[in-house]
Amino acid sequence: MARMKSSRRKFLAAVPALAVAAPVAAQGQGAPAAKKTYRKLTPTSMTVKGQQLYSPELSFGNLVFVSGKGAGVKATGDIQAQTKNVLDQIEESLKLAGSSMDKVLKVNVYLTDIKNFEGMNQSYLNRFGAEPPVRTTVAVTALPDGSLVEIDCIAHL
């Protein structure tokens, strides 16, 4: 009986090590790991005092990440006009990357007033092809430059 308890203790003591070793061993088999490189798609980035804050868009492997686009200096018009403007900007960024609106996988929409949800949807409708991407829409207290809407997305090439 004492020998059985000792064996169980040794086994249980080894379980955490196996949990760590198994995934590492599995990585060594099969296809080689993907090279972790990304490509900035535009040379300009938002900077403050010479320090880069973010990239407007970049690609990583076969994915394209487009950072939040707002109506910006063109922040005129109602929610429908601003949403169209923002989606046009996103479409330009995706084309630059070699992707398109129908290849978008995930969208985040930020509205300064949830009452604008229906108006935003009217401009959003049919912009992403036959199979629209998954989407999250949240209301926020404010957006830069007086924009009523900001949208970011992830697409594939």
Language model feature labels by segment:
Residues 2-84, 95-97, 112-157:
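N-terminal presequence-like segments and the immediate start of the first folded domain
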Residues 90:
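Residue-level signal for inorganic ion chemistry
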Residues 100-104:
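Short acidic capping loops at alpha-helix termini that bridge into adjacent secondary structure
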